[in-house]
Amino acid sequence: LLVLHTAASRVGSMDVGAVTEGGLAAATDGAEVIYNLGADEVEIAAGAFVIYQGSHGDRGASRADVILPGSAWTEENGLFVNTEGRPQLALRAGFAPGEAKENWAILRALSAELGQTLPWDSLAALRSALVKAHPHLARIDEVAENTWTPLPVKTPAKATFRNAIKDFYLTNPVARASQVMAELSAMAKARAEAPMAAE
């Protein structure tokens, strides 16, 4: 069963077990410290000390007590998993500005500062450890053959459908930082509010 997700990296996160049963509330409820890895579409309640690692100083950074500037996905090599579960390589298009570092390097340096040094010191070594733990991630551009059981057919609920995305042009920090995307968003909003002309 393929589900179109509204957040980048969600499929890959599920593949490596980086999800919490019960969602964000279960993961953060009562937390004294929250390490936010660029999650700008979530609201973090007051109280916890927030460390934000991200690229565009968006919503997540505005709630942070400490900001660690990381590369945007276009500024570092990466491994992504698309909706159908296909691992894909992405190559850096440019270098991160200022003091921003590649995200894996920030986590590795922080682990050493905390006396819990992670067992890899390069992207190649990290990727090797990742593939050892999750072998399917080595099969670049291949769709895993998954067995599935048909879901039971039920009478649909009487709830109404709604769009999960309110503004397609401003769905993430990179898009929200773009002047072009802001213009497209404004044009789409004006088009939606304009009266329809009779033909």
Cite the ranges covered by each PLM segment.
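Long, low-complexity segments enriched in small/aliphatic residues
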Residues: 127-199
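Non-catalytic alpha/beta scaffold blocks inside enzyme catalytic domains
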Residues: 1-140, 192-199
